[in-house]
Amino acid sequence: MQEVVTGKRAELLSAEFLKKNNLTIICKNYRIDGGEVDIIARDGHYWVFCEVKFRDDESFAAVIEQIQPQQCRRIRYTARHYLLSNNIDEHTAAIRFDVIAIVGQPTKIEWFKDAF
């Protein structure tokens, strides 16, 4: 149960961080069969699909390394579904896949734009 609470807190911190950096949050926890995107946002003309990762005691690099190719495929699949469901042409839309890494206590946030 603690992991779920921590994950939700990390997603809230990430959304606030993105807002402070002038992104518009469109959707949180977009789920379909076979995938989920933690945060969907707009950064100017970009559609940004964010994966949020939290670890108590690891470096930012270690957190990024934990994102496996299969997870990237699922996020891309889910992003494509979102775009198609909202009549957004995936071939002409500006799309970016970012990672927000939150590490340590007290927490530090690192934003990896165009991470995969």
From Swiss-Prot:
Gene3D superfamilies recorded? 3.40.1350.10
**Pfam families attached here?**
UPF0102
Instruction: Write down the InterPro entries for this protein, in alphabetical order.
Output: Restrct_endonuc-II-like, tRNA_endonuc-like_dom_sf, UPF0102_YraN-like
Domain of life, source organism: Bacteria
All disulfide bonds of the chain are none
Query: What stretch or stretches form a coiled coil here?
Result: none
One GO molecular function term of this record is: nucleic acid binding
Name the family the entry cites. Answer: Belongs to the UPF0102 family.
Q: What is this protein called?
A: UPF0102 protein IL0423
Species for this entry: Idiomarina loihiensis (strain ATCC BAA-735 / DSM 15497 / L2-TR)
